Amino acid sequence: MAVAALLFACTSAKTAEMKRLQAQNAYERGLTQARQGQSALALSSLQEATSLDPGSALYHDSLGLLLLDLGRVDLAVAELTKSAELDPDRGDTLFHLGTALAEARRWEDAVSAYRKAILQPSLTVLDLAHQNLGLALFHLGRYREAEDALRFALSLSPQLQAAYYNLGLVVTAQKRPDEAKALFRRTQQIAPETPFGRAAVERLKALGEGG
């Protein structure tokens, strides 16, 4: 009886290890396929990885990001929520979740996710988290908080074009046109040909500058 139990335990351990390795292979294959623009294959591979190793926060995070990139926002939110539940201290996952929630226009939930991300020492994109937090707060009409978040983002990354543009939106909403013009000019100066740079030109026209 004891021998049978031992054999069963060994077999189970080997099966678990085999699944873990298969999941890792599927994950790495999925990342390679994603880099090569093979989105459908990458999606299949990452889904295989999460199926083989459902306890991996990293695999759910990567799958969620790919789904978000493919515009499947609700599915992305579900995967990123699962990842955050598995590893609540993973700051980048919370940031990714906030981004997905913002795409779904769930602004309150996005604010909550960004604020949790900012509290995590593991977060690698603190400037972007504050920038995105500011934008979410702007959409909620919480302009003072939005301004604080965006100015903090710029203190961390003075060339962060999106933060200048979004701060311009915030001060425009607060009826501070001269400050808004300066911010939109700065947005344009950083990179005129980007979407933010071109949008800044239109904002300046709306404020009576240029033509």
Go through each PLM region and give its residues.
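Bacterial Sec signal peptide processing site at the extreme N-terminus
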Residues: L7-N25
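Structural marker of alpha-solenoid helical repeat scaffolds
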Residues: L52, L86, Q120-S122, L156, ...
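Canonical tetratricopeptide repeat
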Residues: E28, S62, H96, N132, ...
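TPR alpha-solenoid repeat register
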Residues: Y59, T93, L126-A129, A163, ...
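Residue-level recognition of tetratricopeptide repeat
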Residues: Q22, S56, R90, T124-L126, ...
